[in-house]
Amino acid sequence: MQQNDIQLAIIGLGYVGLPLAVEFGRKRKVLGFDIRKERIDQLKNGYDQTLELTQEELQTSFNLTYTTDTEDLRHCNCYIITVPTPIDAHNRPNLQPLLLASETVARALKPGDIVIYESTVYPGATEEDCVPVLETFSGLKFNQDFFCGYSPERINPGDKTHRVNNIKKITSGSTPETAQRVDRLYQEIITAGTHLAESIKVAEAAKVIENTQRDINIALINELAIILNRMGIDTEAVLNAAGSKWNFLPFRPGLVGGHCVGVDPYYLAHKAQAIGYHPEIILAGRRLNNSMGSHVAAQLVIAMTKRRIHVENARILIMGLTFKENCTDVRNTRVVDIVTELKQFNCKVDVYDPWVIEGEAQLYYGISPIADPSPGSYDAIIVAVAHDQFKSMGVNAIRNLGKTESIVYDLKYVLCAEESDLRL
């Protein structure tokens, strides 16, 4: 297959697939496929509900077409799969979306085709889990009739600076020739350059440790924040002082959620356990980060008690629900842990987040965010997500939402140290 002969399809048009499809659509013909008809209809009308891409950006992708029809995939010969890889209720990898996408592609596979995976997985998943599905439903043989590549996504939702094209891309292939083809394909759109890995397993491992390393580093800072808070020392001041040394890593405490950093370590841990090794640090980091919602709720209740604010039936406003700032994604947000804990104390909790897509919080968590918080109504306010709207409000506007003796708990350093009552 020559470069000019590639007929490209992107499978899954979410936070990863859509920006990728748009970039390729500026260079070559691309078919964007998603099983969600509502999503395809919105994109055809120039609207991206994730707000990652504007209508103008979508319109500049002249060669991109959208479909939900699997028959359209038969006209393609190179498929990039970008579906989610979540975990189940027991924190075990859930490969079902990936395997179903593989089955869909397999039914369209022809001799000479290439299937590239971008979804984050544990090392070995592409060749050990996905390839058998491709072989079974296509009737073709791996590395004889069809070939595979792996190029892990590095999307950073809500970040308008680091985009698909200016983030260096890891590439790999199931044969040396396939690896070169995959690398050349991505070079069409990646201005930051590519890194051709030695194997698919190397590329898979590289991706999963990127997020595992970040998770562990945040866990360390979260633990330090708990210790420093007990000593009455401001964590941000300590981090700023330590950061004056050139090799100190600039991590901040906080809730760790979303579909990457809070999930991927479990994939690596799962594989480690499958080969007979119990990972200590990886799972310890996960436990600590998952406990932060309970910690925040407990600290707030203690502060309210000290101020003689009656906890039961207290009205509490949580500002922000998405897993990170300036992003619509509520999947695996750990803000819900705070909501759950406070409701255990019979607090009346309102959640306010202008970024949340209507109906999604109710669908995932049974939470209905309020449209606008009422001034002077709350006994406590938690600034949980650093949306630009919240930063621009300033301390007076935020405090005016509370009663006279209300407590402001700033989890994200949106306010100065002296402007809040509690911080991480």
Placement of each model-derived feature along the sequence:
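Structural/interface elements that position substrates and couple domains in central-metabolism enzymes
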Residues: 1-424
